[in-house]
Amino acid sequence: VKWWQGVSLWWVVGGGTLAQSLVVVYPPPRHTTTSDRIFVIGTAPLGGDVLVNGKPIGRSEFGHFAPSFPLQLGKNQLRVSYGNEVIDLTIERQKPALPPPYPAQTVIKPPGELVCFSIPAPPGAAVEVTNGNWRMELSPVSQRSLPPNSAVLTHRATQGETVSLYQGCTRQAISGKYIYKIRMQNQIQTMPAPGALILREKFPTIVVTTDQAITRSGPGTDFSRLTPLPKGTQAVVTGQEGTWLRLEYGAWIEQKDTKTIERATPPHSRIRGISSRNRGGQTEVLFPLEVPVPISIRQEERKLILTLHNVTAQTDTIFLVENPVIDRLDFQQTQPDRVEYTLTMKTKQQWGYTTRYENNTLVLAIRHPSTRPKVLLDPGHGSKNDLGARGPNGYPEKDVTLVVATLLAKELQNKGIDVVLTRSGDEDLFPHQRAEMINQIAPTIALSIHYNALPDDGDAENTEGIGAFWYHPQSHALAKFLHDRLTDKLNRKSYGVFWHNLALTRPTIAPAVLLELGFMIHPREFAWIVDPKSQQQLAKVLAESITEWLSKSSF
């Protein structure tokens, strides 16, 4: 994932001549940010000084630069000059957006459920929220804002600024539009909440209409992902915020991934005998149900734990077919409406799993280790619409990922490993299309090849190294092994190994890792990234590491 986009290129693809000798790739001439600093990425020929606001900046032996500068709130001017060439940059630093008054969108709840109203207001104010004759006074709360998730990538994941909020909770709210009144120094300001509150006694039952529908911990894409729901899953809705539905077991799902169905009773099921079968290089465990119910899956070392929601066990018999992956299957009714199944594995490494409903039977398919490994390589980005990060001279990430992935594919093929590339040219592929290719091809492992950049508050001049990103526990060992081997054998710095919710790390069908093989924006590391001999050496070491890991992990 790249956090910035640069200005139009001053270079010609394929190694053409620069139109001018001073190049600033980032930030664009006019840029808006909430960061308290900004880095400037660019290059100029050696033999002269590059100045920013009249002061010389450090450059690499290749002439590249990436200094950072503090930003004040409002407009900031940076003048980058080299000889007679001048590039002016205007960076506007804005305050982070304050949370809107609640409800920010239409909220539907059952009567008697706790409703918490809140609004930002200056300290010392008197604040109340009203709805016709209904009113409630709110109390001041001094609250620290959370840093963005991207702050982990710049090692600045500390709490943000203090926000002055006024809050109050009640179970006696009424339906309608709410208006906030803020009294400050004998002045009254009124502010309507953007959304409305609707109290509803009855809620519908929905069925999931898309394959592996996304569920989250809250009503929006800012909330964490939970286990996707297979197509056909049925559940009762218990609330709604905007276009997000809250399901009975606690997860939220977008309304567009569902449709309302008529049911006389809530979708609750019993479960009795459980069976299994070997089919197509995997062991399928079959859970016959009266109705397709929501599921949750948790993966641990040597364990895969499946939870069936809205289910009561009547199980007396379980048959586990002889197979190379699952050692034992146990279950426990952990709550009156929840059954937990623990699959204990024979080996430490798990090779992927999928879920689907066949009518009312949940099929949990556990993949066997491959007798002939197949590696999917995804060269990150592609096409003029998705350049990725760019080096100091404007060279795009999309081109170097394709070069390295192609070299790596040849090295792996020479070792007898089957390889599939998500792209072999300049195709324009969205991340979800690449992830779907992983699901369709079902490789032994999937590697997405990338090169790195930073958010605006990063230290571009001093951040370099190889990083690896994983999401499911089955991918952690691969990410750690490749990261450690590359940093050791190539004598490269470590950026780190990260758990990260990325499209190319989320597929469950195979261990999937996203590699960031260096920083495009780093003045010195960029030279290593684009050096043909270094690219060949990287491909060779990476192929050897993949082969070794596959050999060690298959038993």
Q: Residue ranges of each PLM-predicted region?
A:
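Soluble non-cytosolic domains of exported or imported proteins
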Residues: 34, 109, 219, 223, ...
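Gram-negative bacterial Sec-dependent N-terminal signal peptides
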Residues: 1-20
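Short linear recognition/processing motifs and adjacent strand/loop elements at protein termini
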Residues: 3, 20-29, 33-34, 47-49, ...
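Active-site-adjacent mobile loop/cap segments within catalytic or ligand-binding domains
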Residues: 441, 445-448, 452-456, 467-470, ...
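Solvent-exposed loop/turn segments at secondary-structure junctions
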Residues: 381-384, 395, 425-429, 451-456, ...
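Extracytoplasmic/secreted envelope proteins and their assembly/folding machinery
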Residues: 75-77, 88, 250, 402-409, ...
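Sec-exported extracytoplasmic/periplasmic mature domains
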Residues: 234, 406-417, 439-443, 474, ...
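Active-site histidine-acidic residue metal-binding/catalytic motifs
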Residues: 361-437, 441-445, 455-458, 462-464
